[in-house]
Regions:
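Leloir-type glycosyltransferase catalytic cores
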Residues: 93-141
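Short, hinge-like loop/turn segments at secondary-structure boundaries
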Residues: 32-34, 82-83, 100
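Glycine-rich loops and low-complexity Gly/Arg-rich segments
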Residues: 39-42, 70-72, 88-91, 105-109
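Catalytic donor nucleotide-activated moiety binding site of glycosyltransferases and closely related
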Residues: 3-48
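Short, solvent-exposed coil/turn linker segments
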Residues: 1, 32-33, 52, 97, ...
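Hydrophobic anchor at the start of a short beta-strand
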Residues: 12-14, 81, 119
Length: 141
């Protein structure tokens, strides 16, 4: 349903990244039958075993998630992010309505970065710059 909705607004290619636990190394069906993807034009299933999340997002114009910790990387990289579930860790800095997919908002992430850092790092790591050094690689230049 989501793919069809997006295709109604753009003809750009869509890449679907399966959870790594859903595919085995030779990309055959494990937990889910992914053959439905073949019914769509210009949609590709990404090999999430051999292609990293970083590689998957390298050319992304936006990223769409239901609720996934993977959405954190797209926000860190400054990729317009869409999440559907309010409990997503990226909810506050994500778009929620796919009708805006061609003109997504990239909100100010400063407070979100602060909140994320405070939730995962010690005060000492903050003082000595570990947090900044860790996230610096993901920030747009």
């Amino acid at each position: 349903k989501t793919i069809k909705f997006i295709q109604g607004r753009t003809d750009e290619p869509i890449k679907v990244r399966a959870h790594p636990g859903d595919l085995n190394r030779d990309r055959t069906k494990t937990k889910h039958d992914w053959s439905w993807i073949n019914a769509y034009h210009n949609v590709e299933l990404i090999d999430s075993i051999n292609v990293t999340l970083h590689q998957s997002m390298k050319t992304a114009r936006c990223a769409v998630f239901y609720n996934s910790s993977s959405s954190v990387l797209s926000v860190l990289k400054g990729i317009p992010t869409f999440v559907a579930e309010e409990s997503a860790v990226t909810w506050d800095v994500a778009n929620h309505n796919l009708k805006t997919i061609m003109h997504p908002v990239v909100p100010d992430r400063t407070q979100w970065f602060n909140d994320l850092a405070q939730a995962h790092w010690t005060l000492e790591q903050s003082r000595n710059g570990d947090i900044y050094r860790h996230f610096e690689q993901y920030l747009p230049t």
